[in-house]
Amino acid sequence: MSARDGNTASEWVPTGSVTVRVPGKVNLYLDVGDRRDDGYHELTTVFHAVSLLDEVTVRTADILSLEMTGEGAESLPTDERNLAWRAAELMADHVGRSPDVAISIEKTIPVAGGMAGGSADAAAVLVAMNSLWELGVPRRDLHALAAQLGSDVPFALHGGTALGTGRGEELATVLTRNTFHWVLAFSPGGLSTAKVFAEIDRLRAEEDRTLPPRLESPEPVLAALASGDPAQLAPLLGNDLQPAALSLDSTLRRTLRAGVDAGALAGVVSGSGPTCAFLCGSAGAAVDVGTELAGAGVCRTVRVASGPVQGARVVPSPSNAG
């Protein structure tokens, strides 16, 4: 049924807009199993939401539309190929309405950077529409909708730090004491998640290829997070996809080396890359590392961030003006 079919639609859908902020993620630990028959890989990962936030505003409208500005926005589709668009359609379908909203996204999370920016925006649309339309869809149902959109979308709702299993969509909250401080190095280009997974499959199939040992258990990482000690966490950061990302973009080796040379405790490729995340001992150390890394000429740009932060949340409106 279309939202226009009933004469109560205008009463049911308030006018105005809702803005949601949503974080990017870093994978502190990413154990990638062999390719399954369905084409997916079994994952065990520790997600960590960091203070690099996209801002998504959803307004009532006559027709579904999407506009994007900011970090890498010009390279992104603004139609049904975009996960945020599909999130609007899915949410509307879930409640039996037409997806008549205008979505505006201000990007800060890098595009195709291994920080799940597209997934974050999709999660934000679900939260924004739930609020804008006053639906009261419970969190567990939002999580189920998020999992239909993609394996990183549920964590963008969840935020904080979480252990992800399955394809990454099954989440358990992880106790994290303390705030951890990060420097994020953005690469000039992006890496396709599908290509990185295909590359790790290819590398593993080469008999004469020596890869780093696969990750075995997230338990030491969870213990380090509970301790709140960045020095304990640093040597445990790991990513089974890192050899594939380095194979596809060899410049990342220089970036990783430069970050540690600048004073980071450790560096890791985030998810499928190419963003590199550097753990630092303090907020001040992160600023120093970021400054030095920015001048080293090994990445496009540098951001300082901290985590964990909460997942997709409505921004309180400073006024009632729509």
Curated annotation (Swiss-Prot):
Enzyme category, top tier: transferase
Catalytic activity: 4-CDP-2-C-methyl-D-erythritol + ATP = 4-CDP-2-C-methyl-D-erythritol 2-phosphate + ADP + H(+)
Molecular functions per Gene Ontology: 4-(cytidine 5'-diphospho)-2-C-methyl-D-erythritol kinase activity; ATP binding
GO biological process, one term: terpenoid biosynthetic process
Pathway where it operates: Isoprenoid biosynthesis; isopentenyl diphosphate biosynthesis via DXP pathway; isopentenyl diphosphate from 1-deoxy-D-xylulose 5-phosphate: step 3/6
NCBIfam families: ispE, PRK03188.1
Gene3D superfamilies in UniProt: 3.30.230.10, GHMP kinase, C-terminal domain
Organism superkingdom: Bacteria
Function as written in the Swiss-Prot or TrEMBL entry: Catalyzes the phosphorylation of the position 2 hydroxy group of 4-diphosphocytidyl-2C-methyl-D-erythritol.
Positions bound to ATP: P110, V111, A112, G113, G114, M115, A116, G117, G118, S119, A120
Keywords: ATP-binding, Isoprene biosynthesis, Kinase, Nucleotide-binding, Transferase
Annotated family: Belongs to the GHMP kinase family. IspE subfamily.
Active-site residues annotated for this sequence: K25, D152
Transmembrane region(s): none
EC number of the protein: 2.7.1.148
Gene name of this polypeptide: ispE
Protein name listed in UniProt: 4-diphosphocytidyl-2-C-methyl-D-erythritol kinase
